[in-house]
Amino acid sequence: MAIGVGGCCAVLLAAALLFSSPATTYAYDSLDPNGNITIKWDVMQWTPDGYAAVVTLSNYQQFRHIQPPGWQLGWTWQQKEVIWSMYGAQAIEQGDCSMSKEGSNVPHSCKKHPTVVDLLPGAPIDLQIANCCKAGSLSAFSQDPANSAASFQIIVGHSGNSNETVRVPKNFSLMAPGPGYTCSRAMIVKPSRFLSPDGRRATQVLMTWNVICTYSQFLAQKVPSCCVSLSSFDNDKTVDCPTCSCGCRNEKSTTGKCVKKNAPDLQSIIHGPGRWTWQPLLQCTSHMCPVKINWHLMLKDKEHYRVKITVTNLNYRMNFTEWNLVVQYHPILDITQISGFNYKSIQVGKINDTTMLWGVKPYYDLLMQAGPLGNVQGELIVRKDFRASSTTNNNKGRAFPVRVYFNGDNCVMPPPDAYPVSITA
């Protein structure tokens, strides 16, 4: 048990998730300007040589989620702190605890720069707390707000045990599981307050500090990770993803390694030595993107377009759980009906021209690895808004999206002059 704070933490944690709200910060994405992951430390109780705290990671990004192998949270202690024990998460290294006194308990971690990960589902009950043990996954806030947060409890020693003697950690880092996030300094804020279930009593923690982490696709990777192709029922030509959208095929380089989909040794390569690594093994294409989205115009009449969207995974070593698309389209269009997808409109400023799509459970929410099952499909019926159309000077390519995001990453679009001619005429 957690030094007498297990029950207290469970109640306060539930209240924290209910009453917490997104913190405002500057982000990198114009479609989600306030998106961030907020890390909140709530000191619940002082201990003889430190404190017990509940740490909560809240994903306030509207359409970017974290999937297994999940988040990794790191920091640097400012004094000689140790982690006596943890619940709901674990430090990946114990470090050198040889300075522990004989006969005393050995700390969970003595690292100056600890890195913490979530526990897996099915972890022992006595190591769990509320909202833990999801293999590091954090759902996007718009897609599944109930699963957009994770928590763990940490018992810290050799740290001081008062507001005056505790030094907040520094140099926070968040991997998800790769790079891309930049974290702020820890800022001491007003202690979190919670209401009792009956709403008649308010309590507050002893001390709270926040860290805000924002994402940059540029920091995460040097090349894009998805691309868009366009096609139409009344044109035989498919406008494919631009060549080298996500890199160029080069069998002599590591980043350009790929395997042909009809290679006779395909299965042995997929299940070879690199099977358990997170290095991508892509199907050879002209664009070399791990994910391809095809926007196909199935039908058009005076008032509507009917569109089929196909999302194809071209990575043999990764599937995508809780994937999502964000589609920004021309203001003259209005989505009226959707099949196979859940959807939510995203208001960007005063213009409502962006929609978030994700797969309906349990049929389309998992995008399998490259192969016969490595795609998901859905259909849209889009109504033309003639009032907006009359004020729009350039309706060229209006049946096609302006921008497409996959799991929060901006996908490479074909150039406008390459759109199917019959639609742009």
UniProtKB/Swiss-Prot annotation:
> Pfam families from the entry?
COB_C, COBRA
One Gene Ontology cellular component term attached to this UniProt record is: plasma membrane
Listed InterPro entries? COB_C (IPR056900), COBRA_pln (IPR006918)
Name the GO terms of the biological process aspect.
cellulose microfibril organization; plant-type cell wall cellulose biosynthetic process
Segment forming the signal sequence: 1-27
Question: Per the UniProt annotation, where are the glycans attached?
Answer: N36, N163, N171, N319, N352
Q: Which family does it belong to?
A: Belongs to the COBRA family.
Protein name, as recorded: COBRA-like protein 4
Q: Which organism is it from?
A: Oryza sativa subsp. japonica
Write the lineage as a comma-separated list: Eukaryota, Viridiplantae, Streptophyta, Embryophyta, Tracheophyta
- Gene name, per UniProt, is BC1L9
